[in-house]
Structure formats: C-alpha cells, structure tokens
Curated annotation (Swiss-Prot):
Residues 145-155 have a biased composition (Basic and acidic residues). The gene is infB. Residues 337-346 have a biased composition (Basic residues). It comes from Corynebacterium efficiens (strain DSM 44549 / YS-314 / AJ 12310 / JCM 11189 / NBRC 100395). Belongs to the TRAFAC class translation factor GTPase superfamily. Classic translation factor GTPase family. IF-2 subfamily. PROSITE patterns: G_TR_2. This is Translation initiation factor IF-2. One of the essential components for the initiation of protein synthesis. Protects formylmethionyl-tRNA from spontaneous hydrolysis and promotes its binding to the 30S ribosomal subunits. Also involved in the hydrolysis of GTP during the formation of the 70S ribosomal complex. Residues 518-521 are annotated as: G3. It holds the Pfam family IF2_N. Residues 493-497 are annotated as: G2.
Amino acid sequence: MPGKLRVHELAKKLGITSKELLATLKEQGEFVKTASSTIEPPVVKKMQEHYQATGGAKPDTDNKPTPAKPAAKPGAPAPKPGTAQKPTAPTPGAVAAPKPGTAAAKPTPAKPAAPKPTAAKPAPAKPTAPKPATPAFSGPTPGDAAKKAAEDKATPKPGGEAPRPNAMPRPMAKPGPKPGARAPRVANNPFSTGAADRPGPRPGGGGPRPGGGPRPGGAPRPQGGQRSGAPRDGQGGPRGQRPGPGSGGPRPQGGNAAGAASQERQGGGRRPSPAMMPPTPGQMPAKAPGKGGRGGGQGGPGGGSGGFNRGGGGGAGRGGRRGGTAGAFGRPGGAPRRGRKSKRQKRNEYESMQAPNVIGGVRLPDGRGQTLRLARGASLSDFADKIGADAAALVQALFNLGEMVTATASVSDETLMLLGDEMNFKVEVVSPEDEDRELLESFDLQFGEDIGDEQDLAKRPPVVTVMGHVDHGKTRLLDTIRKANVGSGEAGGITQGIGAYQVKVEVEDDLRTITFLDTPGHEAFTAMRARGAKSTDIAVLVVAADDGVMPQTIEAINHAKAADVPIVVAVNKIDKPDASPEKIRGQLTEYGLVPEEYGGDTIFVDISAKQGTNIDELLASVCLTADAELDLVANPDMDAQGVAIEAHLDRGRGPVATVIVQRGTLRVGDSIVVGDTYGRVRRMVDEYGRDVDEAGPSRPVQVQGLNGVPGAGDNLLVVEDDRIARQIANQRNARKRNALAARSRKRVSLEDLDSVLKETSVLNLILKGDNAGSVEALEEALLKIEMDDEVELNIIDRGVGAVTQTNVTLAAASNAVIIAFNVRAEGKATEEANAEGVDIRYYTIIYRAIEEVEAALKGMLKPIYEEREVGKAEIRAIFKASAIGLIAGCMVEEGKVRRNATARIIRDGNVIASNAKIESLRREKDDVTEVSAGYECGMVLSYPDIAVGDKIEVFEMVEVPRDS
C-alpha cells in the first residue's frame, strides 16, 4: 500500500480489531491516538513480527488448510459429545503436542484437581480423564490435527446437534477469510450474545469432551482444559461445589472459553493477553447467581459447563445476561479480578511513589538527571516539548518558584536552569557557535574548513591587522604603505571603522601581496579590535616611542594572544626628540613580548610613519613571519567562505558589506548568507572602487545585494540557491531575536515586584550610525555607563544608515532621543522631528556622544536634598486665641525664623514634632516673613501640643549637586 498505513488498515491486514491493535501499540510503547492515525513503517514491521512471534492471525492461516475453513461452522459442536470419544481419542494429544514445553508448566493436572476434592459425587462419569496423559508422545503436527478435525467434522455426532444453534451463528462469518486472526478474539468478545460468539474447533481441538456426568474429585483435569494454577469454579456457585450433573448434556466447543483458548494456543494460534482486551465491569462475571443458563449449551455465561468442566446447574447459571470474559484468558470465573499490570506500569508507579515531583501543587515529570539541550532564549513551550509536559504546568510551577513568565516568552538561561534543577533535569544552554554549527549541519554545510586534498590548496596572501592605542600612528603607517592619505578624512583624527586594503609591495626584489586591516584604537572599539584579531594572520602592534604602553596597547596584545596570532611590534614616532624605543622594549617585555635582541622571538622594528623610515624593513619582517611561522594556503576552487569585517547602509547602493574571503572564490551571482542576512552578489568592488568579478582567498571586497545590513564579524557562506540562504538567515534571525529578548528581559520576582512597579526614570535611545561596527561600539560604551538604580538606559532600536521618518515616529511614540553617529536625517524626517518634538543629536566623535548621554542620565536622577539649619527659638509664653488656637510667644536665639518654614520641636531633649510648619509669624501686631535673632515674635505652629520651654529648630531642605 503506498504511503503510511493507518491503524485500522493494519488491523484489517492482520485480521484483528483496531481496539486490540491500539492496546498492543500502547503496550509496546508506541502511543497512537486513534484508529485513523498513521503508523510509521518500522512500527508496522514491529507489529507484524509481534503477532507472528505470539502466534497471531498470520501463523494461524498457515496452520489451517483451506478445507478446514468451511468445516469450522458446522463442525463446532461435533467434537464435543460424549459419544465422540473413540474416533477422537488421540486428539487431546494433538492439542497439547504443539506446546510440549508448556504442557508440564501450565496444565499441571495436580493443581486443577487439588481445589476440587469435594466433587466426589460425579466420580464415575470421567473414564476418559486419564487419556489426556498422552501428550507425552510427540503427537501429530498442527496440520495432522487439522486433518483429524476435518474427519471428525465429516462424521455426524449425535451429541453435538443440540448446541449447534448457539455454537457459531456469527463469529465464523468473520474469520472466514482469516480464521486464524478472528477466531480467538470472537471468543473474548464481551458484547456477544451467549455461546454464539464462541469459536469453532481448532486443528487438533476435536478431542473428546467429558459428558455431563460428574468427574472424580481427585482426577486430573485434561490437558486441553483451563490454564495451570487456577481451578475452574462455576461462574455462579462456590468453588469446587457444583449443583449437580449438567441438565443440558455435554457442552459444545464454546462452552468453556478457557478450553477454547488453550486449544487455540496448542494448535498454533496466538496467545491472548489481558492487556489486549482490558476487562470492564460489564465484562466481569457477576458474583450473584443468574437466573440459570442452559447446561453446557449456553456457553461462558452459563453455569460453567462445557469443555472439560462439568455441566452447569440451573442455579449457578447466568444465561440471562450477555457474555462475560470468564475463562477467556485461561482464568476461572467468579469474582472480578484486576488485570495484570505490565512491568513498565509497575516501575512507573513505583518511581512516582518513591520521588513525587510536585511544585506548588503541579505534578511535573522527573528527569532523573537527564541532560536537556536548549537554545538560548528558549521559551517554556520549547522546554515542555522537550520533556513531554504541559507548558501551562511549567508556567504555574515557575510562578510558585517566584518567577512570572508566559509560555511563549523567551526565558533567560538562569530561569531555565532553575526550573530544570527543580525537575531533576540538567539543562545545557547551547552556545551560539554550537547552535550555528548544528544549523549548518542540517543543510549539509560546514564552515571553517578547506574542502579537497592537499593538491587543491594554493598559497594565499597574509592578512595583517594594524593594532595599537589611539593616536599612535596606525592609520599614518597604512597611508605611508599605500602612499595615500586616509587619516585626514576621519573625524577627530581617529579611526572609527575597520579599513581593509590589499597592496602590492616589493620585498627583497619580490612583488608580494599583503592585505591590511586598520582597526580603531579608541577604547570604545574593543569589539572591532577583537574581530580584527580573529580575522587576521599577523598583528602589527604600533606603539608610539614618545608615549609608551597604553591601555589599548595592552588590550591589543591580549586580543592577538587570544587569537593565537604572531605579533610584530612597530615602534613609531622615533623622529620625535623625546622618543625612547628602548623604554618601549622594556615595557613590552612585561607583557610577554621579548625582543629578539633580548633573546626573545618577537620582531621589533623602529619606524617613523611620517618620515617613511624603515617601512621596507617592517614589510620584510611581516613577510618573513608569514613564511616562517604560518602555512598560508587555501582552496580557491571551493564555494567561498569569509567574514564580514564591516557593513553599512549606502543610500544609493543599499546594504554594503566589506568582507574578506578566507577560502574559495566569491563570484558575482553567488547566493550568499551573511549572519542573519542573505541575498545574491549583485556587484563587488575593491578598495579603490573598481568593479571585481571574482575575489579569491585573502581578498577584501565590498559586496552589494544583501537584504539587510549584516553584523560586523558575521560569517559569509556561499550556498546552493537563494531558498537555502533564506531559510538559514530566517532561522538565525529567529534565534537572535529570542536570545535578545531573553537577555533584555528583566527578571521580576514576587519579592521585588513592588520596587519594580515604582516609577523609575528611563532614558530611551535610538542609535543610528554609518556602519555596523560604530553602532555596536557606541551601544556597548553607553551600556557601560554606571548609574544608580533610579535611572535606566534603554536602547529601543539601533540601525545603520540615515535617520528616517520611521525612526522619528518610534521616538515620538516611546519618548526617545535619537543619537545619530556620522549620519544625518533624510527627507522629511527633520520636519517630522520638529513637529513631534523629537530630539535628534548628531555626533562625529564617539566619546562626545558618551559624555553627553552620561550627563543626561545624571540630570534624570532624583535630586539629593540635605538639611540646612536656619535658626533657633524658645517658647517663652503661650496665648490662646479662639479663632487661631495656641500662639507661641518666642525669642529667636540664633539665625532667623521664617514663615512657612519647617521646624523641629524639642522638649527635654526629645523631638516631639519633626516636621512642623510655621503657619503664621508676627512681630508685635504686624505680619512678617522672618524674624532675626534677638527679637521676640509670635508664631502659630501646625503642631498644637506645645509648652513653655520647648525649643524650636527651624531648618530647610537644600538640593545639593551629585558627585557622580
């Protein structure tokens, strides 16, 4: 069948019911919802093998020849009368022969006989009881048993005519096409009516059935009877006591379901299990006797007669109700018994009782130390999918742990680990590098390795990064090498972006190509310097001979060492009078850079970038280091891989990324993905603005055609087509968004909820810059500003390019300030900003932007007030006025007393009023604003409980400037 099978289709194919197949799937650990659910091919194969191994429908069809199928209907009662003992004498042996191993273990004659010694009255009626002992011989095969059964069916049996109407009216119509599959289940159908649902005879199941007479009390039960270990008690009467001989004569095959099931098993059929048909109260046999069933002929619901059991009595029968499952699985009838539990159910129950995992009334799964890998910024829904739990339960559990999180919100790493610890899960947050590698592997891509053999590799030019402190001459050095002037065009004379150049220089009469990267030296550009160190082969550390080792010099050394990049030191400005190259060598020795002349392995070159002194010697040292210490090779024939060292938004060209190809060849028209952006290479230009059709290893080019501005430092990868590039970029973008949301989300616990809800001063900023590196550096520098908890800096948006109307609209809605770094407002953005009252600040030097933002944050701080004493007075007399109240007659002892001032009232050294107001102040009969020391006055205080002798201290709160 094409496609996946559904449950009901597989059940039909196997010849079983969908309910039975669903139960088996659940027992095997395959959880399928409904009969219309699809099943994977491995599960289909597993079920087929399961039913073949347990003797299911398929093997039965092999063991039952075609002639036996039509004979099953009329022959069902034939083998069971008392007169059929002679022709079917060997049949019990045939029944037991297919299971010689179980003949001794299960149908042990001693166990069934032991509980029934009281049945001594019917002793003479079982002369054939010893015959089932014949299973000791090998016995005929199931095929022989089928032949014998067919012969028995062909012979008319007088005793079998009576029960025929109830024997097989319905079930054999179903198992007709697949008798081996349907026959055992029909006997177990609790919704059948009487013995009509009992299966027909099995191959080898035509053995003699005892008559209705009583059985000897100590006689062993025949082999084809019920299962071992459980005696057959009548389904209404007490165990071992039968009302008497069966009133209906010998029972047909359907009378004892246990016998039928046993014959089916011994005849090659599958073995039913209680888990396949869980008993329900409607299927259980009743404890109270029924109204009396037909002796033997009524089947399972009767008084327990039929098969190898004695005929049922009227008092013990249950013929009036629908068929039960007594004896269906080889167990006796009687009181209902709970179905057996699987080992998995028992183990799960035991483990849940041993260590219940309940958090705040929510029951959660126990991880038992299992390791979970979650992406950074994952939500509780992602967590719940991993462990198979309900996301709402995790939300409630986390709320009880003091964290308020929604099911779909990105959660911080600490919160994920906290929740994992509570459930005994070990949560591992996947690093961005591992996450990106797994993403590329899902598309059969990899980054960072050359593809091909060694003969495919070719030499490539070295990539050299010029690093050092600000104003130490890095850009001037590159200008001298390139014979150009770049530094004069930079704002403030400092480099605020990475410049990439490829120059051809003559070194020892050999024309060499070297790629140079110029990194910023200002402290705000730490990330740029680190990125430049990771993208390079050799680092040239420029140190001014007149300035010495500075903080950014040390930082550049650490970046180069972290990237495991060899360092060549260029001691610049040796032409200045106060230059001291030897001092520089001594200082750098402390940081592990020991000159060769001191016995170390670091090359030091004294240069003057301004005068052009020793520039050739520096280039020769760079080439020598590249040849001696590095094996600079790459495969130029593979798909290009590289890194974006800078990116910006050009108004006429759109997003432009400056990339260095590390391996392979980048061509116009290639589909590329750079970080979370993608596109097709529309145009490439070199550092001189000339169009380039292809760029080989170590070649810096500017790429146009991306759908957005990538981040500085993002990897460039050529993929097969735009569809793959778009999928990779979208997944990266979603992960980046989740990680950013988790990082920016402030953890709010119930304990600090009150303080969070209090009004705080927030400065919202929108950052716009000329390139991605500048925006990144500005954002990091602003976030490093240390302020009190009273104010908060919130960067709500950042981007590359001019200030647009969209930025102004967002700023107006969020009451934000726009910081424009090396860009201007375009179009009607300025008019809209003026109309909306949006403040746009323009900067060209980064530290000025940092200083002004820091000053703005300080201005947003709540003012600090301190108490300043104004004067002191003493109450000398108290006057009463009906309209005013108490009037204090005072003498001003120090300073001044002002009207509406705040006063502190002290009595016997204790403050009785700390914040009283001077509501009225008079001198003689005149209202005055203040009274100086040495004068008397009358005042009315807001605090009425005053007395003669009280001291009044008048003070005021004065705002003081903040130090920080």
